[in-house]
Amino acid sequence: MKKFSLILACLFLTGCATTNMPSYLQPKKPYIKRYYSNYDKTLSSVKSILTELGWGLEEATDPGVYEHTRFNDLDENKLLLVTAVRPTPMLVGTRYARMNIYLRSKKEVSEVEVRYLTTTSTALNNFSTYNNDGAVKRFFARLDEVLPPVEMLSK
């Protein structure tokens, strides 16, 4: 009985860690790829692939709202897609994931940049990582089937 009371008291005193998932993800580990495709075709392909992979769109906005200093040679048409937070229950806590997809296009070349944030929430702490190679590779592999890639860029 004493052990149970001690465990219960510890759980009561520790509480829960609060998880806050930002809409805008910093460019800590971006994945970038260029395609021979115009803006409209790239946008429709990206949206359909996100839906196919189980991601919901929360917001579509101009990236200039969040980033003012970045310049790219493909800045004629640009858009930031923010996915909805995707929770995954785990044994110890819950993992929350979100993606930002940046589209930059000029004429017949489009650049797709994916930023991924995973936050694992446990009773005591939150752990965040800015990459998920497997999920992003699945996204780009599916996009490669639809659009012809130019080259892989790394930063």
Segments (PLM) and residue ranges:
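Ser/Thr-rich, low-complexity intrinsically disordered terminal regions
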Residues: 17-155
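Sec-dependent bacterial lipoprotein signal peptides
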Residues: 1-18
